[in-house]
A protein has these predicted regions:
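Glycan-recognition and catalytic cores of secretory/periplasmic carbohydrate-active enzymes
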Residues: 24-266
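Bacterial Sec-dependent N-terminal signal peptides
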Residues: 1-27
Length: 266
């Protein structure tokens, strides 16, 4: 047998051996199911941990390994109730529904918040999923009240929803890319109420953001502040990224979701 034949035989032997020792591929459905079961167990443990702490919601684990909590006013307050509703959708048990309703109730006061653009995050994740899965009319009422609260942050001269109220010496009317995530709430509110005002505000905000937040390479600024008289940008900066001209990864994700969603809705 010549050298070429030896080489070919060696390569074939290695490939056959490697193929035979590869672990059996687990069907993706089983991987997903296992992950959701683990998520359900962990979510229920968390829900029970804070069950007797009225009004409290999970926030983070600090460096000492202790659980930190928040009240309804934290911008992520609606995420845990939303998680419980998604897990209830996966496995609709009475226990999961009980906790989803309990933690959703803890963010009800968000409906009166007029100092933050995150009302969409906070209510649509929690009450939005609760309403989608149960059809409870009181959930719809909370969200429509919240939509009207959020609408107070829209300025006709700028054509967008104001994000923050701090740093007024630096920003006149700051709009952050994150705000695209709240437009889905307005889209729902228009359909649920028949009031086209919400939809028009969402479209105007998206158009304004598309026009002024993006660079030539389609990376986006974190903060664009508008002149409240002319409605035009006067500052383009970052508040959480590495630098004003950098592309903040989380902001890029907000933009991808927000504009994909607005394309779907329009």
């Amino acid at each position: 047998m010549n050298k070429l034949s030896h080489s070919v035989l060696w390569i074939v032997t290695v490939l056959v051996t490697a193929f035979n020792i590869q672990p059996k591929q687990e069907p993706i459905e089983e991987v997903i199911d296992r992950g959701l079961k683990a998520s359900t167990e962990q979510a229920l443990l968390m829900a029970k941990e804070l069950e007797t702490q009225n009004g409290r919601l999970p926030k983070t684990i600090n460096k000492e390994g202790k659980l930190e909590t928040s009240d309804y006013s934290w911008w992520c307050s609606g995420f845990f109730p939303g998680e419980l509703w998604y897990l209830y959708e996966y496995n609709p048990t009475p226990e999961m529904k009980k906790y989803a309703e309990m933690y959703t109730d803890r963010v009800e006061e968000v409906k009166h918040i007029t100092y933050s653009h995150d009302v969409g995050f906070m209510l649509y994740c929690s009450y939005g999923n609760g309403y989608r899965l149960t059809g409870k009319p009181e959930y719809k009422d909370v969200m429509l009240t919240g939509a009207n609260s959020l609408a107070t942050r829209y300025d006709e001269r700028v054509g967008a929803i104001r994000s923050w109220d701090f740093n007024k010496k630096i920003w006149q009317f700051p709009v952050i890319i994150d705000n695209m995530m709240n437009l889905e709430f307005f889209s729902w509110a228009s359909k649920a109420s028949g009031d086209d005002r919400f939809r028009k505000m969402a479209i105007s905000h998206a158009d304004k953001t598309m026009l002024h937040h993006f660079r030539d390479d389609y990376s986006c600024y974190h903060v664009v502040s508008y002149d409240t008289i002319t409605g035009m940008p006067h500052k383009k900066q970052t508040h959480q990224g590495a630098a004003d001209e950098s592309a903040w990864a989380r902001g890029q994700a907000w933009a991808l979701y927000g504009f994909t969603m607005m394309y779907r809705e329009t």
